[in-house]
Amino acid sequence: MLLFFKDPETSDKSERFNFKQVLTVMKLPQVWILCLILCCTYVMNMSYAYFNPYATSTLGVAMVGGTIVTIMADYIRPFASVGGGVLADRLGRPRIMTIAFAIMAVGTFAIALFPKMSVPVFVALCALVYVGMYCNYGIVFSLMDDGGIPMEVSGTAVGVICTIGYLPEVVCPATAGIILDTFTEAGYKYYFLAVGIIMLIGIVGIMIWNRSMKKQKALNK
């Protein structure tokens, strides 16, 4: 139990929380850009679960089949995460994230706009969305290496980015619930269209990030 206590005489005062670090971090534009990118990425993580009820209620897929569509994401995750990291190291993180956002946008728009598609096509689209989703989720924080965020506030920066970037965990279920309660089965279409638009916003976020990094490199020369 003594391991949980620190001697007040030996405590390092520099380790205490400093609110000024939060203010310093919130003044960094790259932190807000990362918040936007993470937020757009995590929207899909919180939305793919609706593929299951959409498949069973709109496409007429059996309950077992709808469950398989959701579980399939867990099997794709390790391959997409590792593969995305390898490709990001070779081709560049922003480029891979842009491609992944585009894949998610195309897949989600197709699911929303073509409700009479065949089940194999639907499963293939879901698989593509999962690949893009876990590819981005696996490399989003690696962008911090290029962001020029000072090491002394990097922990605080991660805290701020996560606090804002993970807001979809609260917002998405509430939003989806309101849309589905209002429009019933048609609500899936509207919700997926909104998700697709957010994926396009993610691409814009990457473009802003690239421009910010170019300016930063020019200033450092």
Where are these regions (language model features)?
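C-terminal membrane-cytosol helix-exit motif in multi-pass small-molecule transporters
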Residues: 1-11, 205-210
